């Protein structure tokens, strides 16, 4: 592990955007400090003088990386923000934990210099007979510091947060062994969230690249991260990511379990899988994607599909079921998995192993048969007070999207829905971040709680840093559009502020209020790079004479100067121009 290269790679990430600063809103106690990004705005100027514009505060996922007062050494990890809250509840205990084995990283014998140097504390687990999930506390009527933190972030009451979690309509992914994470919530009555996938593979990428991608993704707005590593150094890569990640981290444990049996699905066992769950639980993974709904009798339903089974986890479990001609150990041992989850407060992300991989397969019998089983498993998890969200498709044309949400809400009793897109057409490799963002905005509007991003590299290759940025921004647009359509409180404040800045030609404010300030500035400066252009009352699209907003502004100024309404000003101006035309000889061409 080249520690210096990781540190160097993150230097550019550890800064806020231009015109912004990190601010904190304090809760009921001094240790509840909720981060927000405050965007300063310049005053409105005109013939009337100056009028101040209040700063705009926006949701911030970047963690302490963008706080100039915080020094971060990624070899040591972030400070354990939630450690005191977790231990003060008195229901957890330290223990030695399992020893790290060479096979955890995909080796037959230990490889030197790949372990994470920073973690010194022992793992935590629930004391015997205790349940440490946020859902358990919520059902008991307890408002935790995590819930209060979230209430401030979401501009709702702590009691509302508690009630949504208790009902199962929302989850707070918060493993007690990931105290570095800043509490967040996933539920349809809150801001639509987005997830970014990272992870190495047997073909490409490294620990350095994945840590950099993580910090890069949260800078641009990723609400959670999923580490989907499948190559070597899986355990160590995950440790580096979790120790330095201020947002929840999810995984698909079957990927690592498969590596431990050299990629032979038939050789997987419950014992190997269980050991992998505990390994990742002790590291601090906040939610597990588990494809427990892939049943033996559902596999034949995929035989006539255009694209068969496209989920990696789903294909692994289908292969195991066929080889052993029995139901998967994920299904038969589901209650035991629940026992593990509630010891660490890990949320289920019940995987859609039979999701459609093409629009031709959307909403078919296999997809909805699995959904019925996910609904049954949700009820079992809730009996253990384990938090659950449900994964969804996939590839779905626009006219079939709403049916997915309606069925999921009914069958899974409003557990949060977490979808990959969906892609609304299959003809645009290289642009699937766009084909999927169309579906993501729609499904978010209908009630999906979290959207898994898609990058331009989808179906083509492993995304690099630039692809991650493109995917995150694209999905922030989709999520925000859904928030606006749902009428989420305060969602339109930023839009209105940017629209006002645009009308008043406050170019710097326009850049700073945008989801990607750097791209907005870059595109503006390609044609108008001079500093004076940042105050000009036009852009290169229309030029100074044809700018509709400048003309509108001139009308307003004229109306104010002549004590007229805007309609009267337009009418008066038309009469003056008509008289000017007649006075100059009524010639069309001068």
Swiss-Prot record:
Gene Ontology BP annotations: thiamine biosynthetic process; thiamine diphosphate biosynthetic process
What note does UniProt attach to the cofactor annotation?
Binds 1 [4Fe-4S] cluster per subunit. The cluster is coordinated with 3 cysteines and an exchangeable S-adenosyl-L-methionine.
How does a null allele present? Cells lacking this gene do not grow on minimal medium or on 4-methyl-5-(2-hydroxyethyl) thiazole, a thiamine precursor molecule. They do not synthesize 2-methyl-4-amino-5-hydroxymethylpyrimidine.
Keywords, sorted A to Z: 4Fe-4S, Iron, Iron-sulfur, Lyase, Metal-binding, S-adenosyl-L-methionine, Thiamine biosynthesis, Zinc
User: By what name is this protein known?
Assistant: Phosphomethylpyrimidine synthase
Gene Ontology CC, one term: cytosol
Presence of the UniProt keyword Membrane in the record = no
**Cofactor(s) needed:** [4Fe-4S] cluster
Q: List the disulfide bonds.
A: none
Give the binding site residues for [4Fe-4S] cluster: 539, 542, 547
Q: Catalytic activity annotated for this protein? A: 5-amino-1-(5-phospho-beta-D-ribosyl)imidazole + S-adenosyl-L-methionine = 4-amino-2-methyl-5-(phosphooxymethyl)pyrimidine + CO + 5'-deoxyadenosine + formate + L-methionine + 3 H(+)
Say which species the protein is native to: Bacillus subtilis (strain 168)
UniProt cross-references to Pfam families, sorted A to Z: ThiC-associated, ThiC_Rad_SAM
- So where does Zn(2+) get bound? 395, 459
ATP-binding listed as a keyword: no
Look up the EC number in the record and give it. Answer: 4.1.99.17
Which residues does UniProt assign to the signal peptide? none
Q: In the record, what terms sit under GO molecular function?
A: 4 iron, 4 sulfur cluster binding; carbon-carbon lyase activity; zinc ion binding
- Classify the source by domain of life: Bacteria
Task: Relate the protein's function as given in its record.
Answer: Catalyzes the synthesis of the hydroxymethylpyrimidine phosphate (HMP-P) moiety of thiamine from aminoimidazole ribotide (AIR) in a radical S-adenosyl-L-methionine (SAM)-dependent reaction.
Q: How is this protein induced?
A: Repressed by thiamine and 2-methyl-4-amino-5-hydroxymethylpyrimidine.
Pathway terms, separated by semicolons: Cofactor biosynthesis; thiamine diphosphate biosynthesis
């Amino acid at each position: 592990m080249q520690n210096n290269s990781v540190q160097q790679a993150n230097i550019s990430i550890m800064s806020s955007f231009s015109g912004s600063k990190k601010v904190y809103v304090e809760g009921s106690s001094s240790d509840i400090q909720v981060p927000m990004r405050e965007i300063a705005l310049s005053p409105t100027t005109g013939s009337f003088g100056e009028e101040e514009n209040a700063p705009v505060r926006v949701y911030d996922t970047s963690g302490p990386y963008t706080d100039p007062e915080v020094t971060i050494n990624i070899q040591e990890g972030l400070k354990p923000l939630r450690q005191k809250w977790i231990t003060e509840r008195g229901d957890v205990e330290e223990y030695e934990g399992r020893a790290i084995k060479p096979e955890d990283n995909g080796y037959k014998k230990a490889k030197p210099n790949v372990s994470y140097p920073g973690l010194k504390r022992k793992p935590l687990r629930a004391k015997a007979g205790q349940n440490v999930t946020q859902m358990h506390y919520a059902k008991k009527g307890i408002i935790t510091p995590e819930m209060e933190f979230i209430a401030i972030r979401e501009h709702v009451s702590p009691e509302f947060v508690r009630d949504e979690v208790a009902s199962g309509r929302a989850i707070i992914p918060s493993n007690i062994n990931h105290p570095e994470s800043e509490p967040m919530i996933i539920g349809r009555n809150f801001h639509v969230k987005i997830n970014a996938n990272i992870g190495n593979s047997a073909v490409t990428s490294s620990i350095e690249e994945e840590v950099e991608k993580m910090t890069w993704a949260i800078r641009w707005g990723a609400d959670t991260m999923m580490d989907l590593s499948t190559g070597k150094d899986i355990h160590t890569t995950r440790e580096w990511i979790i120790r330095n990640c201020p947002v929840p981290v999810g995984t698909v444990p079957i990927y690592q379990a498969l590596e431990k049996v050299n990629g032979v699905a038939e050789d997987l066992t419950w014992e190997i899988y269980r050991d992998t769950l505990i390994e990742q639980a002790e590291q601090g993974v906040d939610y597990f994607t588990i494809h427990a709904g892939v049943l033996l009798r559902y596999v034949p339903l995929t035989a006539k599909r255009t694209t068969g089974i496209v989920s990696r986890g789903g294909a692994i479990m289908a292969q195991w079921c066929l080889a052993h001609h029995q139901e998967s150990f994920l299904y038969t041992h589901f209650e035991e998995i629940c026992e593990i989850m509630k010891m660490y407060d890990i949320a289920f992300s019940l995987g859609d192993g039979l999701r459609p991989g093409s629009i031709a397969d959307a909403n078919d019998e296999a997809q909805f048969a699995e959904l019925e089983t996910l609904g049954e498993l949700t009820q079992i998890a809730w009996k253990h007070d384990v938090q659950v969200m449900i994964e969804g498709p996939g590839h779905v044309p626009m006219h079939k999207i709403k049916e997915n949400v309606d069925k999921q809400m009914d069958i899974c009793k409003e557990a949060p829905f977490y979808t990959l897109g969906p892609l609304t057409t299959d003809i645009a490799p290289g642009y699937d971040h766009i084909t999927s963002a169309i579906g993501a905005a729609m499904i978010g509007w209908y009630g999906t709680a979290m959207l898994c991003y898609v990058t331009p590299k989808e179906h083509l290759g492993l995304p690099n840093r630039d692809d991650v940025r493109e995917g995150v921004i694209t999905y922030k647009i989709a999520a925000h559009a859904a928030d606006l359509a749902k009428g989420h409180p305060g969602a339109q404040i930023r839009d209105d502020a940017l629209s006002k800045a645009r009308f008043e030609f406050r170019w710097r404010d326009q850049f700073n209020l945008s989801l990607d300030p750097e791209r907005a500035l870059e595109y503006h400066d390609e044609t108008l790079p001079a500093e004076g252009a940042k105050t000009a009352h036009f852009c290169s699209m229309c030029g100074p004479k044809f700018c509709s907003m400048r003309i509108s502004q001139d009308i307003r100024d004229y109306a104010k100067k002549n004590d007229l309404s805007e309609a009267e000003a337009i009418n008066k101006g038309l009469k003056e121009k008509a008289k000017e035309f007649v006075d100059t000889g009524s010639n069309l061409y001068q």
